[in-house]
Amino acid sequence: MHAERSPVVIGVGQVLANRDRTVAAAREPLRLIADAVHAAAADACGTGTRLLRDVDAITVPHVASWAYADLPALLAERLAASPARTFSAPVGGQWPAALVDAAAARIAAGESRIELVAGGEASASLGVLQRAGVDPGTDLGWTAEPGGPAPIGADDLGSPAMQAAGMVLPTRVYPMVDTAFGHSVGETPAEIMASGAAVFAALSEVAATNPIAWNPAARDPAEILRVGPDNRMICEPYPLAVNAFPLVDQAAALLLTSRAVALEHGVPEERLVHVWGGAGAADAADVLARPALSGSPALCSVLDRALASAGLAAEAVDVVDVYSCFPVVPRLASRYLGLPTKALAGATGGHSSFGGPLSTYTLHSLAACAERIRSGAGTALVHANGGYLTRQHAVVLGREAHVDGYIGDPEPHDTAEPGPAPCPLAEVPEEPVRVEAATVEYDRDGHPAQGFLVARTADGRRLAGCTAEGDAASARELTVFPEGPAHPAGEAVVGREVRVRPVGGRIQVDPA
């Protein structure tokens, strides 16, 4: 590839808004995103008006806090641009990395000249307005095409088997995966929690220095582990402090082009951040159809391929920014890459401390890593995750162009393999089953509310189910906190044998 077609990031813009959560400061996502775009253009070359008019592709991650019939078209209208290519991505945290990687591939191939990737959320403002009885559309004039929070499709919740088992929320599924992963590497529940707390403490230190962070305060692991009214247990073993915090108003934008076009628009050479390329992969969308719940072949695949194509060893990368909606994601990456979790804290600050603007988060990571490279870092690896640890994408950025030009592989590889045959609840055997993954969800008063279980029968079939709400006896069989979550964790549940009985579409769990 000719060096002049090397894809580069030329402008980054980030917006933090309404952290005080007032009605007066509430703005819809479109306005926040447009502000981020103008900031990116100014970052590239002053006002950037001509640059924005010349944009020929606009792609956006999914926006959940407000629905738009055609967000790229609305942005194009505001920018006086006439893009030949537009795309609004479905739900998925991997999309910012995938969109930037695809944009870089098109630029390198000469298929486009200037691409814009932008997104954002206004979930904090939407909550403020709802509590105040203010209608964003009729009272504040937010866009009404169609308007309102974006609907969640049934497919976004999980497979029918997952839905029947109550595995329809990330707050339930990710801790279940972590219990399986921890057991597979010989960790006790206390060690799983301590590892997660260390990850999120390191992330909070980064957030404390990030002016776009929603919660910019450094926290130590002991504080993160301490369960109480301000840090209640959500789903074992995750207290609130290690859960993503989506109620934020944040937006980000990246402008990409070739080196030649960048110089044509007057962007200084030292401001260019080269997109070396990336890799995408996907595991089975149905968590219960995966061969094992203790890992992610897709995560390993994208890290392997992105680094191998770039000719980099993990320990040689200057900035490694791994997705951090829940501790299990950086824990898995740390184990696979052979790096300490602190080395994966990156440049953003994590979904709890920086804020978790849903599908847009990694756009902030890419912007923050681009700034790190401009400040002297040589390379950055940005990882993104979507679904229930399902879809993965990683991108490598560099201060200099890669010797081979763009080396990415933006089309995701399918890593799905057939898992164990399911065991319908109606056929649950009377003999004990072995726990593969489990969690207990707590109510807002700090009491165990419901248990969730994945287990294997003696012949290897997998069963999944949830207990009835208020079934304290079953919750006791699945909890790692026999004395309550304010006390130290006890023995692991994963690997233990229990008896399961179907009761009205739910399960009752008894000792083996």
How does the language model describe each region?
Residues 101-102, 292, 358-365:
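Short, surface-exposed amphipathic charged segments that create phosphate/polyanion-binding patches used
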Residues 354-362, 374-377:
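A conserved active-site cap/scaffold subdomain adjacent to cofactor or substrate pockets
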Residues 112-113, 377-379:
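Nucleotide donor/acceptor-binding cores
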Residues 96-105:
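Conserved phosphate-binding catalytic cores of ATP/NTP-utilizing and phosphoryl-transfer enzymes
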Residues 248-250, 361, 390:
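Short, solvent-exposed loop/turn segments at the edges of secondary structure
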Residues 1-90, 104-112, 116-248, 252-254, ...:
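Conserved "HGTGT" condensation-loop signature of ketosynthase/thiolase-family condensing enzymes
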Residues 387:
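Active-site capping/gating segments
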Residues 367-374:
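Oxidoreductase and adenylate-handling cofactor-binding alpha/beta cores
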